[in-house]
């Protein structure tokens, strides 16, 4: 389910007041503006969600304008907002077919209030200046944490803003939701690329490359690497080896498997998640640095795996890193993924105008 309906007992309207069955007089809420922002790594369908939010808001009598934060929460802090109301319905509809983050994204995590009260006060200033009553934050786990913090702080500050988290992550690692918008399209890209690359390697394996290593995203969750298994068929044995973050890397067993596969099939296709790690928890590709979210910066696991194979087995290899290609491949997006990306955006607006707060839309 993507939405819900709340029953009420309002039966008539008089002089800008709602009269319910218990004769309570409730002033009608004035329509407010909304802010939508994108955060973290983008996808080929995140703009489909943006399209849904804007289209649903335009149909609601409780929302006037929808502003978009340029470069995510950073744009809101800098009061660098995009007024989407000046765009035609036709222009907004084009978002459904555009990969990347059309409004810009960021990797900026709000600290706890006691560590960065200045930022929270700045958000209140911007919200007040633009009559914001709704905040939609489209992102992964860190983004949902930000949405929760803003909802709590605005409430405590006496300027409550309805905050709704909209899921987006190609890693498919958010809790509660069955799957995450963005994942399906990347899974399709990886499975297709794995099958195509396998056919290439197989055709040259007699006299050239024996091993192909394909690196995909997925720091702590192996959903993307595992999706390469969809390439397997009766006539295609690749991928022969999939290295997941959840399964500790054992070099001895790995090398034996590579030799066994080549002996049997003549070539070996390996798909490895960027988060593949040793038993002690150290990433194979640990670069020794961290990103702006405090996560370890990974330096590329495919060349590391290739190095191990070359050093221990002396086999000719090629490796590839799908990197941004996998998450921006709109030309091969999954229709189910597109449908879900639109549905969660539409549901976010429905939840917000019905009075829900601190909610994460889930599938």
What are these model-predicted stretches?
Residues 39-41, 69-74, 107-108, 140-141, ...:
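Short, ordered loop/turn segments at secondary-structure junctions
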């Amino acid at each position: 389910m993507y939405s819900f309906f709340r029953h009420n007992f309002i039966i008539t309207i008089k002089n800008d007041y709602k009269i319910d069955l218990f004769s309570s007089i409730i002033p009608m809420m004035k329509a407010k503006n909304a802010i939508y922002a994108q955060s973290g790594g983008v996808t080929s369908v995140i703009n489909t969600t943006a399209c849904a939010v804007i289209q649903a808001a335009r149909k609601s009598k409780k929302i006037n304008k929808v502003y978009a934060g340029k470069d995510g929460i950073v744009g809101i802090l800098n009061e660098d907002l995009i007024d989407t109301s000046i765009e035609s319905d036709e222009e907004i509809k084009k978002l459904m077919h555009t990969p990347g983050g059309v409004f810009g994204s960021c990797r900026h995590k709000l600290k706890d209030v006691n560590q960065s009260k200045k930022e929270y006060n700045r958000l209140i200033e911007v919200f007040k200046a633009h009559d914001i009553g709704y905040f939609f934050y489209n992102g992964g786990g860190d983004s949902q944490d930000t949405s929760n913090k803003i909802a709590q702080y605005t409430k405590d500050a006496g300027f409550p803003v309805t905050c709704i988290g909209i899921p987006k992550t190609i890693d498919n690692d958010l809790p509660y939701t069955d799957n995450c918008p963005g994942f399906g399209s990347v899974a399709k890209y990886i499975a297709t690329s794995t099958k195509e690359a396998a056919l290439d390697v197989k055709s040259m394996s007699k006299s050239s490359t024996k091993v192909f290593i394909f690196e995909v995203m997925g720091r702590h969750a192996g959903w993307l690497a595992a999706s390469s298994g969809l390439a397997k068929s009766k006539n295609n044995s690749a991928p022969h080896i999939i290295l997941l973050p959840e399964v500790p890397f054992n070099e001895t067993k790995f090398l034996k498997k590579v030799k066994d596969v080549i002996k049997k099939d003549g070539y070996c296709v390996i798909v490895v998640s960027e988060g593949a790690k040793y038993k002690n928890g150290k990433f194979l590709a640990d670069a020794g640095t961290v990103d702006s979210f405090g996560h370890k910066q990974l330096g590329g696991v495919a060349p590391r795996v290739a190095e191990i194979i070359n050093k221990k087995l002396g086999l000719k290899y090629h490796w590839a890193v799908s990197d941004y290609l996998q998450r921006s491949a709109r030309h091969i997006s999954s229709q189910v993924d597109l449908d879900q990306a639109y549905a969660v955006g539409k549901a976010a607006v429905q939840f917000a105008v019905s009075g829900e707060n601190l909610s994460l839309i889930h599938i």
